[in-house]
From Swiss-Prot:
Posttranslational modification: Palmitoylated. Undergoes rapid palmitoylation turnover. De novo and turnover palmitoylation are both mediated by ZDHHC2. Palmitoylation regulates the cell membrane and nuclear shuttling and the regulation of GPCR signaling. Upon depalmitoylation, it is targeted from the plasma membrane into the nucleus. GPCR signaling inhibits depalmitoylation and promotes localization to the plasma membrane.
Keywords: Cell membrane, Cytoplasm, Lipoprotein, Membrane, Nucleus, Palmitate, Signal transduction inhibitor
Organism from which the protein derives: Mus musculus
Domain notes: The nuclear localization signal is both required for nuclear localization and palmitoylation.
Protein name: Regulator of G-protein signaling 7-binding protein
Annotated S-S bridges: none
Localization per Swiss-Prot or TrEMBL: Nucleus; Cytoplasm; Cell membrane
Phenotype when changing C253S: Strongly reduces palmitoylation and its ability to regulate GPCR signaling. Abolishes palmitoylation and its ability to regulate GPCR signaling
Lipidation (S-palmitoyl cysteine): C252, C253
Membrane topology summary: Lipid-anchor
Gene this protein is translated from: Rgs7bp
Organism classification: Eukaryota, Metazoa, Chordata, Craniata, Vertebrata
Source superkingdom: Eukaryota
Family (UniProt): Belongs to the RGS7BP/RGS9BP family.
Amino acid sequence: MSSAPNGRKKRPSRSTRSSIFQISKPPLQSGDWERRGSGSESAHKTQRALDDCKMLVQEFNTQVALYRELVISIGDVSVSCPSLRAEMHKTRTKGCEMARQAHQKLAAISGPEDGEIHPEICRLYIQLQCCLEMYTTEMLKSICLLGSLQFHRKGKEASGGAKNLDSKIEENAETPALEDSLSSPLESQQQCWQVATDIENTERDMREMKNLLSKLRETMPLPLKNQDDSSLLNLTPYPMVRRRKRRFFGLCCLVSS
């Protein structure tokens, strides 16, 4: 290496230094790309699961509203009781299945109980809880109505007595749908047995939905457990703060036209 006139050694040029001390970034390994891809894929899966859960809760809300309309129709003289009870059983069974699926999906995407939670998940928890509470209430109403009409029928059969045709026609016109005119005592006994079976099935489904409601409350995230009823539906992003209650915060169990 040549020396400068003043005795100092000549430093390498800038280009030489850059070539000597050049530091290149190592290429991304396959694992880095996989981690980046898996992060976006995980977020996409979470959003898709959230959308599926939201749709399930909305469908369950509709089923509860339909079941409520059927319960109101019990005893209506314009409705055939056997067909009404069959439709109630179909709607109730479908609603119970939707409630179970919604609870499973919601529990899967909620994450740790004491961790950060998306406000949309909080709303789904509250909506599902409200629907389940209304669902069990309507089941109890149907049990009471069917039981009272069944008791009314048995009381009239026990009283007995011959009736003329005119009085029977007048009675049938004022009788609730559960008391359809029967041609024989055997059919009457079969009808009573079917109603009793429907009541037992409804009681079983009601117990199952109450247990599901208890599980939902147990697995509910801590931010929701710490909120009072007045602020449950006025949720803000985590951490939650209390807000003024809005006038219209949403409706539960309405059939959309």
